């Protein structure tokens, strides 16, 4: 698996996310919710499934207390976490700034969809792991020593405990002092879990 396949491409256009859960787009501007048709549906499908959109709309509606099609910026982090994202306060602030929304502002559903898409895309576990491994593998050999990877996983970003790293290595069949090949490691730890 080549590294370039895991790195994100250009971000989607905001127009790609102007889609309500029912499949109809809305016209943005001065609070208008005038339908624009479903011509954007196929473009949206390449980013989010209809099931995801419906799930996001349901969560968004829980925080849209006035039922005006908007949620408070202060509710954004909680709404994102309810949907399985793990944004930091700094990431939430950057998302809001990107869309010109201050901490006391509001955001509509299409903006929420865009933010969720960008957050989920940036949280791609394969990408995160690859970037961590590339930091360790300065000579670009295609592998890192398990001890070096352990050091990075326990000291950077969302730090793992030594027990969590042990569990991760055990799951991926990695010896504590062995070599860790990118492709094999990423493949093993990102396989979907089995339902028993």
From Swiss-Prot:
Disulfide pairings: none
Compositional bias segments (type: Basic and acidic residues): 17-27
GO molecular function term, any single one: myosin head/neck binding
Top-level taxon: Eukaryota
PROSITE patterns: EF_HAND_2
CDD domains associated with the record: EFh
An example Gene Ontology biological process: microtubule cytoskeleton organization
Keywords (A to Z) from UniProt: Cell projection, Repeat
Official protein name in the record: Calmodulin-like protein 4
GO cellular component, one term: cytoplasm
Polar residues biased stretches: 29-39
Pfam families referenced in this protein's UniProt entry, alphabetically: EF-hand_7 (PF13499)
